[in-house]
Curated annotation (Swiss-Prot):
The family this protein is said to belong to: Belongs to the sea anemone sodium channel inhibitory toxin family. Type I subfamily.
GO biological process, one term: regulation of signal transduction
InterPro entries (UniProt xref): Anenome_toxin (IPR000693), Myo_ane_neurotoxin_sf (IPR023355)
Name assigned to this protein: Delta-actitoxin-Bca1a
GO function terms (MF aspect): sodium channel regulator activity; toxin activity
Entry keyword Disulfide bond: yes
Length: 43
């Protein structure tokens, strides 16, 4: 999950992701749709 928010740097990209089972909470976006009901959510 590559994001612009603060997080550990991996190959020059910041990572900040949380796996949600029912989409993403308000203020977050789903950066990778693994399955219809699973969201890899980033701020």
């Amino acid at each position: 999950c590559l994001c612009n928010s603060d997080g550990p740097s991996v190959r020059g990209n910041t990572l900040s992701g949380i796996l949600w089972l029912a989409g993403c909470p308000s203020g977050w976006h789903n950066c990778k749709k693994h399955k219809p009901t699973i969201g890899w959510c980033c701020k």
